């Protein structure tokens, strides 16, 4: 069975992985100032950071509309026996709803709610591509993805709250206080939504080390076959702290490093770093 895997650009997989596994992305719309850009195509995190650092507001993201999804799916629906599109969490965006509406135009397009974002979504996308390469049927892959979605854990540590404040996701006073006290919040996807789960204090590398210990120490329920390290212009020492923690606690067989894209990076800001893995069945 000839199966095509597609996803929303929020999955933040590298160009190398996309080429290797023949994965195609539907770009999110990024609204910055008076202009609209396509995530990963006409705008990248560095562009957002330069805009915000120059005094501009953080960008807003918007889903592609159903007609755009129809146009996106059409060539793949004609070329492949089946198309499986893995969407950003339905609780975070209307991408899933719009993709489902578009999929109704085709008999061979399925849409899966990843219940995640960034490489939490990317974890499912890469698994789907590997299963397709192994010869699984589209029905089997979709069933596996639905079972996997609520076992994927995404979390990260923010270096600052300035970008969250500018986007309206926290108050400027809270951001100022957190930055003044050196507080680094840790966010995670819980039930398809981003929530603050812990707060650390100190330099970012020290906070990252504590974050990894809290996340992995003493656990025996983790699937150690694959882990993502996702970062956005990581600060010195942070990548080393993450990898040291993974070696100590995780014993992961495959460590994949990826860059956080425009959609999440525009809210979290530079310095953000985290990991993604799945729990055992």
PLM feature spans:
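Mixed-charge interfacial surface used for oligomerization/domain docking
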Residues: 4, 10-24, 29, 35, ...
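Class I S-adenosyl-L-methionine
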Residues: 36-105
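Short beta->alpha junction loops
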Residues: 63, 113-115
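Short, contiguous strand/loop micro-motifs
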Residues: 1, 59-60, 86, 161, ...
